[in-house]
């Protein structure tokens, strides 16, 4: 089982793949989950808009789209991340780009672990889970 990192039409972000993979596995383990096949696809705003329209019938830009292929406690999915939106968000929230990128990377994993962020009170739960995961990365 593996975590892969790919790009579509853009330069690969400067992330430490081995460390990031180990961090993702550690976060998943806190939810009693194992990694199956996870593919991160880093892309542009235009690509994520295309994916959003084609597969979700949403006509807007977003930072991440997670396609869930999980089976039991094994996490599998395709996670599209717009690096342009991540950069915009880091500026808007006045956070370092690297931190915002890792927040987005783990956000998709947390969705695969069953954490939602659309209903009442769910955004706060997701944000707390993201902060806990980011703290694990810094240790």
UniProtKB/Swiss-Prot annotation:
GO function terms (MF aspect): metalloendopeptidase activity; RNA endonuclease activity; zinc ion binding
Source organism, top-level taxon: Bacteria
Cofactor: Zn(2+)
Cofactor descriptive note: Binds 1 zinc ion.
GO cellular component: a single term: cytoplasm
Binding annotation for Zn(2+): 107, 111, 117
Function comment: Single strand-specific metallo-endoribonuclease involved in late-stage 70S ribosome quality control and in maturation of the 3' terminus of the 16S rRNA.
Protein's name according to its UniProt entry: Endoribonuclease YbeY
Species assigned in the record: Bacteroides fragilis (strain ATCC 25285 / DSM 2151 / CCUG 4856 / JCM 11019 / LMG 10263 / NCTC 9343 / Onslow / VPI 2553 / EN-2)
Gene symbol of the encoding locus: ybeY
